[in-house]
């Protein structure tokens, strides 16, 4: 087969995540109280995975994922001794550190049965750095590649390069 293709739509939920948050009195930054929190996470998603083999020795792997991971029931609060209240409500916010879009492009070529060159290009869309989604990291590409040589049944050699798009850093 010269192509293998799989696509999946999904709904995933994780319930009863437990955490403790330290909330600060807005009138006195030395007055800190811990607040217990039990929350859920849910996402809908679509993933498509393909492997294409257009000619002998060449493989091209492609993966695309779209997801929308969100906090549910993420709210808690405390009342301080001076009567001031402080709380957080992140219900509906995007889960930290998880991108909405992932893309993988992985070409490889077997020069001989024992010698293979390969590369990998991975894209991660914007990821949030905090619960309130106020801070984020821009989308980014990670690139790497290498060569693998099976010298004999007892010895294999390989060389890798991270950051292919920045050759001076390999």
Q: In which residue ranges do the predicted regions lie?
A:
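Basic phosphate/pyrophosphate-binding loop/patch that engages nucleotide-derived ligands
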Residues: 1
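Asparagine-centered polar/low-complexity signal
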Residues: 36-38, 133, 163
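Exposed loop/turn and edge beta-strand positions of beta-sandwich/beta-sheet ligand-binding modules
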Residues: 44, 101, 137, 141, ...
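Short glycine-rich, acidic/polar surface loops and turns
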Residues: 142-146
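Gram-negative outer-membrane beta-barrel transporters
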Residues: 4-14, 18, 30-127
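C-terminal beta-signal and adjacent terminal beta-strands/loops
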Residues: 123-130, 148-170
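Short, surface-exposed loop/helix-turn segments at secondary-structure junctions
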Residues: 131-137
